[in-house]
Regions:
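Active-site neighborhood of phospho(di)ester-bond hydrolases with catalytic His/Asp-centered motifs
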Residues: 22-23, 53-66, 81-84, 143-149, ...
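Active-site-proximal loop/helix segments of hydrolase catalytic cores
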Residues: 121-192
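Local beta-strand N-terminus motif with an aromatic residue
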Residues: 53, 77, 160-161, 195
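Binuclear metal-ion centers of metallo-dependent hydrolases, dominated by the metallo-beta-lactamase
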Residues: 94, 98-105, 157-159, 174, ...
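Pre-active-site segment of Zn-dependent metallo-hydrolases
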Residues: 18-57, 68-73, 124, 150-157
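Conserved beta-strand hairpin/beta-sheet module of binuclear metal-dependent hydrolase folds
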Residues: 1-45, 128-147, 163
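Active-site HxH/HxHxD metal-binding segment of metal-dependent hydrolases
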Residues: 42-107
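Active-site environment of divalent metal-dependent phosphoester hydrolases
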Residues: 29, 61-66, 87-90, 105-108, ...
Length: 262
């Protein structure tokens, strides 16, 4: 199993011989609702769009997960699996094979990878977007992804999970508090799922941000601090900080309990 971190929330996941592009923002700026004075993300150098993609997986319909300029550059015939909000985005862009997953629903890619949607991040007072469990059916190895650190207690039933992709630092706004939840949330999900590896997401990569929101943001925590917290809580989980753009193999060992069913 190989992964490549593509900055922000974006990953290339190579699992069971399939190449899954997760929440891609690879070209152009990142702006929410065309309000660039509030928040704007840019890349000093654009990422090349990976080729031979078997599936695009989108956790949310917001621009930092379903990034329209990037999605416009990708082949519209690539199958897409996403939250209902994300499905609307790619439908408007003319994608031809779209699967909208509600919480608890599953999609199987070529009888080799099972993708299960779980409750994810809140968007507004009533809407929960998606987190995902990706299971390699031949080995039982499983990846959990929740890009903003909102982990549903329903995940406990799927333990153990081998790899957890989640923020491990907090991004905090005055008065509002953390809107990216790392630290405590990441420790909690580590205790639930007992992962072999945790991979930080959302707050890293070769990107630059500007705008009023960025001036107010405060980051709390670090990978080294979180690794120490895991050890203090007697967890053997290893934190790996990937080099953006560099493909790496996950150092996973088979576990007797990995044969659970979704």
């Amino acid at each position: 199993m190989y992964l490549t971190y593509l900055d922000s929330n974006s990953w290339l996941i190579e699992i069971a011989g399939k190449r899954i592009l997760l929440d891609p923002w690879l070209v152009g700026p990142l702006v929410f609702g065309n309000i660039d004075w509030l928040f704007k993300g840019t890349r000093p150098k654009e990422r090349p769009i990976p080729d031979n993609i078997d599936l695009i997986l989108l956790s949310q319909g917001l621009e930092d997960h379903a990034h329209p300029p990037t999605l416009k550059q990708l082949d519209r015939n690539i199958p897409v699996v996403g939250s209902p909000n994300a499905a609307k985005v790619v439908q408007e862009l003319g994608y031809t094979s779209i699967t909208s997953l509600g919480h608890g629903e599953s999609f199987t890619l070529n009888q080799s990878v099972e993708i299960k949607a779980v409750p994810g991040s809140p968007i507004g007072p009533t809407l929960l977007e998606n987190g995902y469990l990706l299971k390699e059916l031949a080995s039982g190895f499983t990846i959990s992804d929740e890009p903003h650190g909102y982990h549903s207690p329903s995940l406990k039933q799927f333990a153990p999970v081998d790899v957890v992709i989640t923020p491990i630092i907090d991004l905090v706004l005055p008065i509002v508090g953390p809107f990216i939840k790392g630290t405590k949330s990441a420790l909690e999900v580590a205790q639930w799922l007992q992962p072999q590896v945790m991979l930080p997401t959302a707050a890293g990569g070769d990107v630059e941000f500007e705008g009023l929101l960025i001036k107010l943001l405060r980051a709390v925590g670090s990978a080294a601090e979180f690794q120490a917290t895991l050890e203090q809580n007697h967890l053997k989980t290893r934190v790996i900080e990937p080099t953006p753009g560099s493909r790496f193999e996950l150092p996973l060992e088979r576990r007797a309990l990995a044969a659970y069913l979704f």
